Amino acid sequence: MSEALTEQKSQKWAISLFTIGVFMAALDNGIISAALTTINESFSVSPSWGSWGITLYTLGLSVSVPIVGKLSDRYGRKKLFLIEVCLFGLGSLLVALSQSFPLFLISRLIQALGGGGIFIIGSSHILATLPKEKQGKALGLLGAMNGMAAVLGPNIGSFLLDWTGSWHWLFLINLPIAVLLVVFGACFIAETKAPEAKRLDAAGIFLLSLSILAVMYGMTNLDGANLLHSLGNPEVYGCIIFGILCFAALISYEKRVEMRGGDPILAYSLLRNHMFQRTLIIGLLSGGLLAAVIFIPSYVEQYLGVPAAKAGYWMTPLALASGIGAWLGGALTDKKGPVKTVILSGIISCAGFALFPLWVTEKWEFVIASVAAGIGFGFLLGAPLNVLVSEAAKTNKGTALGTLSLVRQIGLTLAPTLYAGFITAGFDQIGDEINSRLSDSGYSEKAMQMIPEIDSSEVSSLQEQIERIPVPEVKTAISDAIHASVASGYDHLYAAAAVVSLLVIAAISIPAFRRQKR
């Protein structure tokens, strides 16, 4: 009896430590965005160079996730968790102490290699140690922390920057947390790993890393404002084609490794599993839903008229709702199973995102819509997809979870570029919309000449120019035209997110319906 209580207490400690680790790692990619301008000025680099602080972290996460998942299955999840936290802490220290921008970028890469696997290790540990009826809630808790940290990162970064006056503290704050995680993790986390350990698939790791880096780098060079034109950029299509060829070579190689009885980094039999394939598709779509959240601050600023300094705070209702949704999704997965949970997630998120173009005109309406959307996609953040891939993977849970996380990251990288195209299209309509409204109202050519130059720039700068127009009627007509054009761009964006939610429902329900029919 006492042994059972001790084990239960140890499991609670382990889950708490994994939760803190997940929050710390997920927070770091968003927290830097608040200080990006300050960091660029500190190192005297351009914004385009400065953005590499985020891009390199994203690339590092993408590469490390599937590899760490496999290594944790092989060498032990506790051991890899402690190594990952140490790497993340070391990277944070080096970032804070960086005296040059190249060293800053290298340190960010070390951070990413350390933070990338923490969520995967925690999830696979839960799936390996907890009974099935308790896995959902625990995974939901991890998912809640992961989602909330990603959404709240910019706000927390702004607060710390205002409080300390230095961007270095955004990273130094990780050090005491990392030390405590290592100390308590060594004491309370039980070691778990896959039953067999064969020779490490070094060639597979190399091919997988090369494929991920090439595809993700190509995607980061896409331009949402000129999507079709950017696809003709050699840095885009060249990298993506090279990455696809590397992945094809990886599949061929891994098939031979598996046939010879080896231990591939990405099991060929797992990729052929239909449930695993469908779950990866849903994972890709879930990244698309998360990407829609990125545009919330600009939406409330440009459409609802919230000051830029306060726009980020309007992410809070959605962040809290996504955390609640992740927890509810975990509980529902335990009771009703992952398939029904995913279907309900799609229904709620579709309704939430659809409210943006169909209903939202006031701030209180925005809060209701964002809470509904947050609860909906929050369901997908933790339990249901993780349970689905682990059931398909059986023993190689870390590998399966790592692959799922990678695919979600691809969706999260690609979707903002596509969404930005909708916003750009809305801005491009501003000039025509203004001309049309003034002409319909019978204003003269002289009134037309009062219109400021429209170059699809910030709405706030356009509004400043409009305030200088002396004729109130002209001023009102132009303001209404700008508001309508901006609304058009965001309406299409969130309508697309609602469609993505419907695709989630289709991806999980159509195969289930076919199985029942048989």
Swiss-Prot record:
Any one Gene Ontology cellular component term annotated for this protein: plasma membrane
Compartments in which it is found: Cell membrane
Disulfide bridge positions per record: none
Transmembrane segments: 13-33, 49-69, 86-106, 109-129, 141-161, 169-189, 202-222, 231-251, 280-300, 312-332, 341-361, 365-385, 410-430, 493-513
InterPro entries: MFS, MFS_dom, MFS_trans_sf
Pfam families assigned to the protein according to its UniProt record, in alphabetical order: MFS_1 (PF07690)
SUPFAM superfamilies: MFS general substrate transporter
Membrane topology note: Multi-pass membrane protein
Record GO biological process: transmembrane transport
Annotated keywords: Cell membrane, Membrane, Transmembrane, Transmembrane helix, Transport
UniProt keyword Transmembrane helix present: yes
Signal peptide region: none
One GO MF term: transmembrane transporter activity
Similarity-based family: Belongs to the major facilitator superfamily. TCR/Tet family.
Protein's recorded name: Uncharacterized MFS-type transporter YfiU
Lineage, uppermost ranks: Bacteria, Bacillati, Bacillota, Bacilli, Bacillales
The gene coding this protein: yfiU
